[in-house]
Amino acid sequence: MAAVQAPGEKINILAGETAKVGDPQKNEWPEQDRLPERSWRHKCASYVLALRPWSFSASLTPVALGSALAYRSQGVLDPRLLLGCAVAVLAVHGAGNLVNTYYDFSKGIDHKKSDDRTLVDRILEPQDVVRFGVFLYTLGCVCAACLYYLSALKLEHLALIYFGGLSGSFLYTGGIGFKYVALGDLVILITFGPLAVMFAYAVQVGSLAIFPLIYAIPLALSTEAILHSNNTRDMESDREAGIVTLAILIGPTFSYVLYNTLLFVPYLIFTILATHCSISLALPLLTIPMAFSLERQFRSQAFNKLPQRTAKLNLLLGLFYVFGIILAPAGSLPRL
């Protein structure tokens, strides 16, 4: 996303706010440009939209998958642990989205034509985003503490997985800023794939295992497709802003190839599982028409709402995958 500034404005890198040249504060909206006070309902709606809730499939489906694997392998499913795990992962995911909003604005990357205009349009102010992000990270830590109290999982194992995910969500754009040096795809692939599935599985059964990481692969690829479609859409504006993403490195043609790979390899995996293990794993194949629709949209370079539509596919694919695992006969799937 390109850094487009109106004449007479500059970006305050440290504070992440826009200030008029000559404004002595340079860290607050000019008094005459401040928005009028809004109702608490309108502000609550603004906070919800700032979280980008359409992307939450990337965190909810891994939690559901990890819990389903725990149920099928060990016969355990504690609703309290499922709820606590879901809230913890959602809180970290939402906070990570806010960190991304804050740093993209601070670095002058977001602009009036950006998909996320929470700060550009002054829907919220930077300090609002910071406070909300701190609240969500705190909520996630409280949930993690509750999970330790309720689960038999060792503290060091729970802390390793949880704070690994928390660090990934922050460092994606904060601190090191993996997103800006073409490593964001790797962070998302790990955090919202194997790590989240392992977290949900481990808190249920009280121990770690390798096989949930294998079962997480189809979901991880589908989740990465969301990010890659977003980065491909923003390729030109990101290049102008001076940041580097994987989409920029490989170019439009190979970005199209990669998107199709991320989109369709999960179906190949499900076909193999349905053929050799259980027919219930063919359920995710019901979403293939949606995948072909997304492929056509990407090929025609109609990127508007493509990440949101890819997230919808990710949600449906994940739910059918979870149902397929639950419905599979005992012993038909490896390790289940």
From Swiss-Prot:
Membrane topology type, per the record?
Answer: Multi-pass membrane protein
Q: Name one Pfam family in it.
A: UbiA
Q: Name one GO biological process term.
A: vitamin K biosynthetic process
Which residues belong to the signal peptide in this entry? none
Reading the lineage from the top rank, the first entry is: Eukaryota
Q: Where in the cell is it found?
A: Endoplasmic reticulum membrane; Golgi apparatus membrane; Mitochondrion membrane
Q: Which residues carry this modification: N-acetylalanine?
A: 2
A GO MF term: prenyltransferase activity
Q: Which reaction does it catalyse?
A: menadiol + (2E,6E,10E)-geranylgeranyl diphosphate = menaquinol-4 + diphosphate; all-trans-decaprenyl diphosphate + 4-hydroxybenzoate = 4-hydroxy-3-(all-trans-decaprenyl)benzoate + diphosphate
The annotated pathway is:
Quinol/quinone metabolism; menaquinone biosynthesis; Cofactor biosynthesis; ubiquinone biosynthesis
Sorted keywords for this record are: Acetylation, Endoplasmic reticulum, Golgi apparatus, Membrane, Menaquinone biosynthesis, Mitochondrion, Prenyltransferase, Transferase, Transmembrane, Transmembrane helix, Ubiquinone biosynthesis
Please tell me one Gene Ontology term that the record gives under cellular component: nucleus
Against InterPro entries, the record matches this protein to: UbiA_prenyltransferase, UbiA_sf, UBIAD1
Q: What is its EC number?
A: 2.5.1.-, 2.5.1.39
Q: Where are the transmembrane segments?
A: 81-101, 132-152, 158-178, 186-206, 207-227, 243-265, 275-295, 313-333
To which protein family does this belong? Belongs to the UbiA prenyltransferase family.
Q: How does it assemble?
A: Interacts with HMGCR and SOAT1.
Per its database record, what is this protein's job? Prenyltransferase that mediates the formation of menaquinone-4 (MK-4) and coenzyme Q10. MK-4 is a vitamin K2 isoform required for endothelial cell development. Mediates the conversion of phylloquinone (PK) into MK-4, probably by cleaving the side chain of phylloquinone (PK) to release 2-methyl-1,4-naphthoquinone (menadione; K3) and then prenylating it with geranylgeranyl pyrophosphate (GGPP) to form MK-4.
Protein name, per record: UbiA prenyltransferase domain-containing protein 1
Its source organism is: Mus musculus (Mouse)
